[in-house]
From Swiss-Prot:
GO process annotations (BP): riboflavin biosynthetic process
Name of the top EC class for this enzyme: transferase
Gene Ontology terms, MF aspect: 6,7-dimethyl-8-ribityllumazine synthase activity
Protein name: 6,7-dimethyl-8-ribityllumazine synthase
Record gene name: ribH
Lineage: Bacteria, Pseudomonadati, Pseudomonadota, Gammaproteobacteria, Chromatiales
Domain of life: Bacteria
Subunit structure: Forms an icosahedral capsid composed of 60 subunits, arranged as a dodecamer of pentamers.
Role played: Catalyzes the formation of 6,7-dimethyl-8-ribityllumazine by condensation of 5-amino-6-(D-ribitylamino)uracil with 3,4-dihydroxy-2-butanone 4-phosphate. This is the penultimate step in the biosynthesis of riboflavin.
PANTHER family in the cross-refs: 6,7-DIMETHYL-8-RIBITYLLUMAZINE SYNTHASE (PTHR21058:SF0), 6,7-DIMETHYL-8-RIBITYLLUMAZINE SYNTHASE DMRL SYNTHASE LUMAZINE SYNTHASE (PTHR21058)
Organism: Alkalilimnicola ehrlichii (strain ATCC BAA-1101 / DSM 17681 / MLHE-1)
Family: Belongs to the DMRL synthase family.
Length: 156
């Protein structure tokens, strides 16, 4: 049996777009830092990383779609933080963001890493942006690197 999987090697000419929400930036800023740092540590030069900011997580799917369709990137990394409040708003934003980003990945065939936190509390968001539970932005960047590598291998 042949096993084909991606790796985290420097993808050479690969370009990455980080599309990040400004809302909850006290969390998302750390996700962005984690993602950029992970890419750099794996050999991606700064001039191959673009940061695109949107108002909030609800706007991520459209920006991710436009970025993916532009044809300039090997992968897109979507970052945001949706924190549950006392209204159903959380469910709507989290659900539509997730569905929109997933639909874009399937429609374009471009790897899109989902690093949008959907949490119950501010504490959970902070934990997942670089403290107790690691940095989910860095994890999303590693997922993007691995998927770029895998897509290249599958095309050979």
């Amino acid at each position: 049996m042949n096993i084909i999987e991606g790796d985290f090697q420097n993808p050479g000419s690969a370009r990455f777009a980080i599309v990040a929400a400004r809302f909850n930036d006290f969390v998302v800023g750390h996700l962005v830092e984690g993602a950029a740092d992970a890419l750099r540590r794996h050999g991606v030069p700064d001039d191959h990383i673009d940061l695109i900011r949107v108002p909030g997580s609800f706007e991520l799917p459209l920006a991710v779609q436009q970025t993916a369709e532009a044809g300039r990137y090997s992968a897109v990394i979507a970052l945001g933080a949706v924190i549950r409040g006392g209204t159903p708003h959380f469910e709507y934003v989290a659900s539509e963001c997730t569905k929109g980003v997933a639909a874009t990945m399937m429609d374009t065939g471009l790897p899109i890493a989902f690093g949008v936190l959907t949490v119950d509390t501010i504490e959970q968001a902070i934990e997942r942006s670089g403290t107790k539970a690691g940095n989910k932005g860095a994890e999303a960047a590693l997922s993007a690197l691995e998927m770029v590598s895998l897509m290249k291998k599958l095309a050979e």
